[in-house]
Amino acid sequence: MRMNLKKLIINSLFLAVGVVLNQITPPILFGMKPDFSLAMLFIIILLNDDYKTCISTGVVAGLLAAAVTTFPGGQLPNIIDRIVTTSLVFIALRPFKDKINDKIHMIITTIVGTIISGSVFLGSALIIVGLPASFKALFITVVLPATIINAIVGTIIFVAVKKSMRVVFRQ
């Protein structure tokens, strides 16, 4: 029970930090902002071995993203996006967990995960509310730059989280 409570608290803190960073970060490159909540979700997926923890975190991340979205009508697409992304990233990248370096794993997870997330978000938004431009145009101008930014920022945060967890939990 204690381990589950500790895991729940840590995951909640990561999600909260991701949402706060999303809100206070100004655009960096051509109006693009790193999606800190998505980066934190990927960190949680890498730090947790069980699917139940990851999918419940994905649901909460979707609800938080829906609450703070700036995309018109993006609430439901955000929820769908986070749940699908969490499931696919967990399943697809789990076999490589102990076979590659943590930093490389985070870079791959962030790149693959952001592309999945952006595709699912745009696809579900297209079906549910429509898009202000074509899927292809939005994918090229929004998702691909966000993928690069998230890979860099997510890896930096991941390294900091791993170091701080080693100090705090003396691992």
UniProtKB/Swiss-Prot annotation:
<dbReference type="Pfam" id="PF17099">
    <property type="entry name" value="TrpP"/>
</dbReference>
<keyword id="KW-0029">Amino-acid transport</keyword>
<keyword id="KW-1003">Cell membrane</keyword>
<feature type="transmembrane region" description="Helical">
    <location>
        <begin position="9"/>
        <end position="31"/>
    </location>
</feature>
<keyword id="KW-0812">Transmembrane</keyword>
<feature type="transmembrane region" description="Helical">
    <location>
        <begin position="58"/>
        <end position="80"/>
    </location>
</feature>
<comment type="similarity">
    <text>Belongs to the vitamin uptake transporter (VUT/ECF) (TC 2.A.88) family. TrpP subfamily.</text>
</comment>
<feature type="transmembrane region" description="Helical">
    <location>
        <begin position="139"/>
        <end position="161"/>
    </location>
</feature>
<keyword id="KW-1133">Transmembrane helix</keyword>
<protein>
    <recommendedName>
        <fullName>Probable tryptophan transport protein</fullName>
    </recommendedName>
</protein>
<keyword id="KW-0813">Transport</keyword>
<dbReference type="GO" id="GO:0005886">
    <property type="term" value="C:plasma membrane"/>
</dbReference>
<dbReference type="GO" id="GO:0006865">
    <property type="term" value="P:amino acid transport"/>
</dbReference>
<keyword id="KW-0472">Membrane</keyword>
<dbReference type="InterPro" id="IPR031360">
    <property type="entry name" value="TrpP"/>
</dbReference>
<comment type="function">
    <text>Probably involved in tryptophan uptake.</text>
</comment>
<feature type="transmembrane region" description="Helical">
    <location>
        <begin position="107"/>
        <end position="129"/>
    </location>
</feature>
